[in-house]
Amino acid sequence: MNNSKTNQQMNTSMGYPLTVYDECNKFQLIVPTLDANIMLWCIGQLSLLNDSNGCKHLFWQPNDKSNVRILLNNYDYGHLFKYLQCQRKCSVYIGEGTLKKYNLTISTSFDNFLDLTPSEEKESLCREDAHEDPVSPKAGSEEEISPNSTSNVVVSRECLDNFMKQLLKLEESLNKLELEQKVTNKEPNHRISGTIDIPEDRSELVNFFTELKTVKQLEDVFQRYHDYERLSQECDSKTEIASDHSKKETKIEVEPPNERSLQITMNQRDNSLYFQLFNNTNSVLAGNCKLKFTDAGDKPTTQIIDMGPHEIGIKEYKEYRYFPYALDLEAGSTIEIENQYGEVIFLGKYGSSPMINLRPPSRLSAESLQASQEPFYSFQIDTLPELDDSSIISTSISLSYDGDDNEKALTWEEL
């Protein structure tokens, strides 16, 4: 039992754990890399996807939820990969029959995942342990409905659209009825009479009000006065905002260009070098770069890692491994990042701390740094780029379940 837990911890550090369900089985799978084709290949090795009707659909969810999302395109797989990168536990269900067994509903990518109610969570645990069939609809209808049960009701988007259309029609009818009531209940106008004596020396006022012959003309004067007041207030507020903005602009400090750096944390274990890269700069690191590590020995050697075609966004992490490496890490070792044109765009040295800040060399021009920023690489499941042999790190592990003597070795390629 202890050995199985130890193996599980080791496998977790080497990939992304997934719990996979079909109609009869449940097993734990370590996905080595966030690649849709590799994930499908790993599951397909266990002969769980093929049936008499062809390939079954795949669904996924974070653990302990009552609904699932289907995996069809890059957008769907991107959501799953985002959860796995955050070290969250996720489950994959194979086929609609499996969803029926575990009493799960299908939602769109725009809907949120819903938590299981206490009763559903208890039933789910019992079915996982005893592989029992889900509760029949008749038995479920006889249970008492709690007041909070409506909070987890799943409604299709088509049904919601119909609700919205009906609500809009109801709102239009209410507005029309309210307008009709105002017209029918309109009180008769009460004429207000009065006189204002204007001095004869104010000839402008006398001439202005002499031209007012009707109530409509008086209403126009009243409306123009209110428009003038509103525009005056808006101009005053905009003037204040502009003055505040100009004061703030004078206080803005320009960030010095030498503050941009790539942070690399180096570790050595099991005859391997691990480089965890964190993009702490203010720009995206383009793909097709190379990481060069040169030791500080008497006869220095350089190890090169191809960083792959994918770019590294701002505040994003990526980890690389170099195997084998049996030498001891020494202070003064050099780390360089080269772009696809062979130019060194970041440089740093290894010291007493495992964390190294890589900065652009002083000789690097702004044009060279700008040229290294390539457009975002479009990821497609059906058209994956060909991998260079120099950028492949191959490892073999065995996936097996309890009580199975036949182990199957899986080999993956990690960039």
Swiss-Prot record:
Keywords: Autophagy, Coiled coil, Isopeptide bond, Membrane, Phosphoprotein, Protein transport, Transport, Ubl conjugation. GO terms for cellular component: Cvt complex; cytoplasm; cytosol; phagophore assembly site; phagophore assembly site membrane. Residues 126-135 have a biased composition (Basic and acidic residues). The lineage of its organism: Eukaryota, Fungi, Dikarya, Ascomycota, Saccharomycotina. Residues 21-28 are annotated as: ATG11-binding. The gene is ATG19. This is Autophagy-related protein 19. It is a peripheral membrane protein. There is a cross-link at K213, K216 (Glycyl lysine isopeptide (Lys-Gly) (interchain with G-Cter in ubiquitin)). Residues 406-415 are annotated as: ATG8-binding. Interacts with the vacuolar aminopeptidase 1 (LAP4) precursor and mature forms. Also interacts with AMS1, APE4, ATG8 ATG11, and UBP3. CDD domains: ABD. Signal peptide: none annotated. The modification Phosphoserine is found at S136, S141, S243. Pfam families: ATG19. Present with 1250 molecules/cell in log phase SD medium. Cargo-receptor protein involved in the cytoplasm to vacuole transport (Cvt) and in autophagy. Recognizes cargo proteins, such as APE4, LAP3, LAP4 and AMS1 and delivers them to the pre-autophagosomal structure for eventual engulfment by the autophagosome and targeting to the vacuole. Involved in the organization of the preautophagosomal structure (PAS). ATG19 association with cargo protein is required to localize ATG11 to the PAS. Its main location: membrane. It is found in: Preautophagosomal structure membrane. Residues 157-187 form a coiled coil. ATG19 is important for yeast autolysis which is the source of several molecules responsible for the quality of wines aged in contact with yeast cells. The coiled coil domain is required for the interaction with LAP4. The C-terminal WXXL motif is crucial for ATG8-binding and Cvt pathway. Polyubiquitinated at Lys-213 and Lys-216. Deubiquitination by UBP3 is required for full activity of ATG19. It comes from the Eukaryota. A motif (WXXL) lies at residues 412-415.
